[in-house]
Every structure is written in C-alpha cells, then in structure tokens.
C-alpha cells in the first residue's frame, strides 16, 4: 500500500500550513481493583460488537468513530471512510443489512453535502456521529497553543482506494431487485475515480488527492492495494449496471496488479513511485492477501504468495503488517484468516481467529495491534521523517475485519466465496 494512510495517520499530523506533531499518552485499562478477583463477562461475537455500535447510536444515517476510545487530538471523533465501509460490508455479512444501510446512507449524504466539492468525491474521513442538516462535517480538533481549530491534511484528502471501498460498501448494501440509490452512488464515485486512470508504465490508477481545498496535491504514485480495490469495485459495478465502461476500468486496474507480481520473491510490490513506473519493493501484508481474495483466479495463479507471507511476515501465531514482525496486526491477521477460510484451510483459519480474539479490548472491541506501536515500513506523507505506525488502540477496522473472518464473508464479492 504505497503512501496510503488508509485509516490511522498516526499521531503525527501535517497541517495545510505547517507540520504539527501531536503527542497523546496512551493509557490502557489493566484490570479490576487490586486483590479482588472478578469474572469477565463473555465477549459478544465480532458481529455482535459492530452491530452494538450501531444500536447504541441515535437514529439516522451514521458514521462510526474509527478509534472510539481516543478522547482528544486528530483521531478523536474521526470516522475514516475505509473503516466505515468495511464495517458496512461486515454488517451485511452478519445479516444486519438494515444497520449497514445507515452507514451507506451517511456515505450518500457525504457525497451530496461536502462543504466544497460537488464532483462525486468523498473525504478520507468525516466527523463521527449521526449526519445532520448542512454540510457534511469533517473531523478536527482545537489547539490551545495556536488558539485555532485544526484539520488533518490526510483526513481532508481523497484516496482512490478508500473511495473504492465506499463503492464496495454501497454495492454490498444495494438490493438489486428493489432500488438503485446505492449503486447510483457507487457509479458517481466511480466517475470521479475514472479521471485518475494512468497511461504511464503498466497503467492502472494513481492515488487520488492529499490536502485541503481548493488545490489539494495530486498523488501520482500507484498502489497495488488501491488497484485491487478498484478492479473489484469497477467489476461489480459493471455487473450491477450493465455498463461496459466499468468493465474496461476493472481490466485496467487488474492488469496493473498483475504486473506488480514478482516471481522471484513470490510477492506483489506495494506499487510504484511517483513516476508511475519504478516499483516500490516494500512487502505489505494486504497487498499480498487482497489480490488473492478479490481477483478472479488470483488465489490459484498467485498461490505462492501465501507461503511467502507465512515465511516472511508471521509473528506470534498471527501476522504483522510488514517484514519487521514487531507484533501482530489484528486487521491483517483477520484478512489472512478469511482468505484461508475461503480456500478451505479451516484449521489454519481457526487458529488465526484465536489470535484475533486475544486482541480484544475491555469494551469487547479489538486492538489494532498487539504492541504499543507497530511499524508499517512506510513513512508519513505529512512528515517523511516519521514512520507510519499502528497503535494499540481499539479500532473499528480491526473489529470489522474480525467480523468478516468470523463469518467467512468476502467483502470483495459480498458472498462467502472467492470470485
């Protein structure tokens, strides 16, 4: 995943006019009062946890907070688009389509009610909560030192991979026989992404935009993960609408992913550099697992990627984000568990589910990682001197992928099967 801040941009936040570093202490609940033994209540299923998040909210279209326990700073009240899209798909897989509908309705609201853009794009994050009248709110925080309201440059941008996930969410919720508003919304998002088709190198789609309006930076790198997402989203949109132009875009994105395969290492490159040609050799777990889960025939064609992942990225019975193997990445371990389940490796999948369950937070959610800080191998877009990290915080994305793995539900097909 090349220079993509899918959900957590870390505590290092670049503002539109300066670089600003936010340091927030992380405090974890350890247990009951010293000397008193208590019996822990049984945890709800991952599906039950995500469903409960919806049930506890006020009625109406809704974005869920990505990091619900964070009380201040850039992550407080931030509802990352990717996390919410995965949550919506997980709810469909859990048999809770009506609850997924609430997130889908919020996505449609955000398309129509951005404070600046009216061209079919979405932001990487919106303010968590029930959407209200007026412009769709964006996350931010008050800085007492500067006496200003601040916004994160990544959160206000528009990554094409995140928008692809929003498309997948809308198409998962869509009832083909009864209504079209969700697939119409997916088509609007696809139309915005289409402008980023690239002719350099092996084609595909570039990254999207980064930073504030009116002139955000254009991201000219290309991501294997993004193009996997887009190949699937465009392909599903072609099926749902019967419009062949979406099939052409799906083919272009899938071709790019195919060319990122390196037989020598039995792995996919993360994508390209800004020139659109030079490969980024970083090994990222999702860039290995997602093509096999999402693309027709890929699980067989690139089966050796599973061995490469097991040999180079396994840690503590689970999987890390990259080759550093400093700790378990809960979300990625769920992705691997799901793939193995879909391939029929049930025993291996169940052993990974046990690892995922070990990362439960006190509220029944799931920590993003087993360690305080988990490196990804990438650097922050907002400050290239700082590493991009996952933190040991309860995370909506981790819980949603745990639910998908629990149900054996493929978010790329909205079924319990491979494409």
Predicted regions and their residues:
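Loop-centered beta-sheet repeat module
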Residues: 218-266
């Amino acid at each position: 995943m090349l220079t993509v801040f899918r959900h957590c941009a870390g505590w290092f936040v670049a503002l539109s006019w300066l670089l600003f570093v936010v340091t927030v202490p992380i405090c974890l609940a350890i247990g009951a009062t010293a000397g008193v033994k208590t019996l822990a209540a049984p945890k709800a299923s991952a599906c039950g946890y995500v469903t409960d998040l919806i049930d506890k909210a006020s009625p109406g279209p809704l974005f869920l907070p990505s990091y619900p326990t964070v009380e201040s700073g850039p992550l407080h009240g931030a509802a990352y688009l990717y996390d919410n899209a995965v949550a919506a798909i997980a709810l469909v897989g859990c048999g809770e389509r009506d609850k997924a509908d609430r997130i889908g309705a919020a996505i449609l609201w955000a398309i129509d009610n951005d404070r600046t853009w009216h061209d079919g794009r979405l932001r990487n994050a919106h303010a968590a909560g029930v959407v209200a009248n007026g412009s769709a709110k964006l996350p931010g925080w008050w800085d007492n030192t500067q006496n200003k309201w601040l916004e994160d440059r990544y959160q206000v941008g528009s990554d094409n991979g995140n928008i692809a996930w929003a498309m997948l969410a809308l198409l998962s919720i869509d009832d083909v026989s009864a209504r079209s508003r969700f697939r119409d919304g997916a088509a609007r998002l696809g139309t915005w992404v289409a402008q980023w088709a690239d002719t350099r190198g092996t084609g595909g789609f570039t990254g999207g935009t980064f930073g504030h309006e009116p002139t955000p930076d254009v991201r000219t790198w290309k991501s294997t993960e993004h193009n996997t997402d887009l190949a699937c989203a465009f392909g599903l949109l072609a099926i749902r609408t019967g419009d062949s132009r979406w099939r052409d875009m799906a083919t272009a994105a899938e071709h790019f992913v195919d060319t990122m395969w390196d037989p020598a290492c039995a792995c996919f490159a993360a994508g390209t550099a800004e020139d659109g040609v030079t490969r980024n050799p970083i090994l990222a777990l999702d860039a290995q697992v997602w093509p096999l889960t999402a693309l027709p025939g890929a699980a067989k064609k690139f089966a050796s990627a599973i061995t490469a992942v097991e040999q180079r990225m396994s840690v503590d019975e689970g999987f890390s984000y990259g080759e550093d193997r400093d700790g378990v990445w809960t979300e990625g371990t769920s992705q691997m568990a799901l793939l193995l389940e879909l391939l029929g490796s049930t025993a291996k999948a169940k052993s990974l589910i046990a690892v995922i369950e070990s990362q439960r937070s006190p509220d029944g959610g799931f920590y993003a990682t087993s360690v305080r800080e988990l490196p990804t191998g990438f650097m922050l877009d907002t400050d290239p001197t700082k590493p991009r990290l996952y933190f040991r915080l309860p995370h909506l994305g981790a819980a949603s992928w745990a639910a998908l793995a629990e149900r054996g539900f493929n978010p790329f097909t909205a079924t319990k099967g491979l494409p």
